[in-house]
Amino acid sequence: MCADNGIVEENVSQSGQDVTAIVAANMASRKSSVCLMAGYTGAQVIPVDIGIACETIPSGKKIDDMDGILHKKISHGTKNFLKEHAMTDKQCIKAIETGKEIVKMCSEKGINIIATGEMGIGNTTTSSAVAAAVLRCDPILVTGKGAGLSEEGLLRKQQLIAEAIRSYDLYEADPFTVLSTVGGFDIAGLVGMCVGGALFHLPIVLDGVISMVAALVAERLFPGTKEYLLPSHKGKEPAVELLMKELQMEPVIDGKMALGEGTGAVMLFALLDMALQLYETGTTFSGMQISVYKRFT
């Protein structure tokens, strides 16, 4: 899910919105980090333009004309949530529905497992804001440096999230209102994918903190959704611990990753393949005429 966030106007990231478009284009040409990793596991990467702000990349190519991108743009990025709601309720619903539609499309193509991923400058700010509001905790506990901020930048990021929560009284708001007020199109799309997993009975492998935030919102909106979700890795962002505790999940990989794009989720694919191979073809103790061990734990 590729989308931009209006909150970048507040200097919460060292990168500009042009980076979102450039990385999405690299995904379309199968050159990005997640594409290289997915190729190793035999997975297909589907970059979705659900809200990229820039219309062109430095080469002059237009995002809307690019092959290899699923064009589902709702708007050219969200609004600056410090000044107004990030998106309208209608836009938020459309983003959620888009995520569900993508899972349906994958199901109809015979795909049997899906990994989530996202690309969008400023989305660690939106995800931290959603996490703090839904968990009703101090933003300091769930807000990290994202793609890279100074201590001063981190403090500003935490302060503006706290300001938005106070301004919109989000500790008392329902998850959908929180999502539409301070979230992003990418997060809303991922919420839809989580829900779609339950609807179409497809396991969804969650990537990092942003996917986990989407999973929490999905579970709050539609209890039971999490039964179709598999956590992949524990990244650097501080929100991960609280989110996993709330969802009662335990990520398999602890690599302190912060690469994004869905790379952590794709890494789990390889481990799942190995586990499945062992499950289906591995020799049992009885098959080797070895006495079964007693279980003490």
PLM segments and residue spans:
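N-terminal loops that bind phosphate or other acidic moieties
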Residues: 1-297
